[in-house]
Amino acid sequence: MATQRISDEPAYVLHRHDWSESSLILEVFTRHHGRIALVAKGVKRPSSSFRPILLPLQLLHVAFGGDAEIRILKAAEWQGGHVMPTGDALMSGLYLNELLLTLLARDDPHTRLFDVYTQVVQVIASGHGEVLQSALRAFELLLLREIGLLPLLDAQTMTLLALDPESRYSLVPEGGLRQTNDADRASLSGAQWVALQQSLVDSAPFTATLRACSEVMTQLKPQLRALLNYHCGVQTLRTRQMMIDLQSLSL
């Protein structure tokens, strides 16, 4: 059987680790092939043309070949656009990468999610800190919806009853969306949940969901954190714990 070769494929490096003295294994998120593993041979040599560009949060066009689970990187070209983020922006990007590594199966294409990820990376690189948190929440919602882990947000999950605009509801990992009391500070009104659901199916879902998230940031964040930790099988994601540790050191 002929070896398949893919060329000019939009991609981001999610993670990299040593494979040999001169080579790396890359976990890459591609637009048309989903998350894949590539071996970058000789990339650690000073003369390698790949060495300065195989970085996270940078849009690449790659070529690769092979029929095994781990393919071989043949070419990579940086597409430009922005410099490497630093500080909180960099940690936010690495957090997104950890979510993709944990929740996406290999060789499962998600073209819409790739496009959303590209938009979030642009927000991260822009240095607009005031919208960064809303962008992260929007990506979390769109990721969960894309992979089938987010219940409908315009109905109670267990009963499928429509939400009352004035009542309060919480999103819980094992029960979905359910009614709660007014004293629950992490809850949202029915009208707010419906607005989030409508944003997810908008023709421009990232922009619409970012806008909707900005209105409910304080209440939404802990609910999404609990849901993501549940599906990732951890109490705290590694990058989130690193951010907590760094913040404590700066106090």
Swiss-Prot record:
It comes from the Bacteria. Coiled coil: none annotated. Keywords: DNA damage, DNA recombination, DNA repair. GO terms for cellular component: bacterial nucleoid. GO terms for biological process: DNA recombination; double-strand break repair. HAMAP family: RecO (MF_00201). Involved in DNA repair and RecF pathway recombination. Belongs to the RecO family. This is DNA repair protein RecO.
